[in-house]
Design a protein with these regions (language model features):
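Alpha-helix-centered segments that form part of catalytic cores
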Residues: 1-9
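Short coil/turn residues that cap or connect secondary-structure elements
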Residues: 6, 70, 108-112
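Metallo-beta-lactamase
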Residues: 8-103
Length: 164
């Protein structure tokens, strides 16, 4: 519980975008400060380097928890306009990442064993996001590895390569 502007807000730890991300909920007014956790028109960046063993899995869990919160009438994101359907948007973001995981599996069929950068170039063809794209690609590949759906090895140059 956090007192803010004379109101009591429930603090919801929502790791994924960052390991220490929180959201705030005021059930009396129905306001939910979603920060960078749930955004209305883009998906939050999921970084692969974190003290969390699987940031993407943590993000999925956090999205599920947020989707279960009752009495949310208005979500207030850190980027974009306020929106109403928090549960629906959280589910939509999860579906986006499930599609991204499928896309990685399809890319692996074409590439074979490849490093993070090779996967990133195929995932983010339409726009270069640099380090953010590479770390998010890494988060997805590591998620697959930790789920037992990929293997990671070091190549001759010492680069981490993935087999799916």
């Amino acid at each position: 519980m956090l007192k803010l502007a004379g109101r009591e807000w429930f603090v919801q730890h929502t790791p994924g975008h960052t390991a220490d991300h929180i959201c705030l909920h005021d059930p009396e007014t129905g306001a939910f400060m979603s920060g960078d956790h749930v955004l209305p028109s883009i998906t939050p960046h999921i970084g692969g380097v974190s003290y969390l063993s699987d940031p993407l899995k943590s993000f999925f869990y956090s999205l599920d928890r947020v989707g279960e919160i009752r009495d949310v009438d208005l979500a207030l994101p850190a980027h974009g306009h306020p929106f109403n359907d928090l549960k629906g948007r959280a589910q939509s973001i999860k579906e986006h990442h499930f599609e991204r995981l499928d896309e990685i599996r399809n890319i692996a069929n074409d590439l074979g064993r490849a490093d993070v950068n090779a996967f990133m170039k195929r995932l983010f063809r339409e726009r270069s996001w640099g380090d953010m794209a590479e770390s998010e690609t890494y988060a997805h590949l590591e998620h697959l590895r930790l789920e037992g759906k990929a293997e990671a090895h070091r190549n001759e140059e010492g680069r981490l390569v993935y087999d799916l």
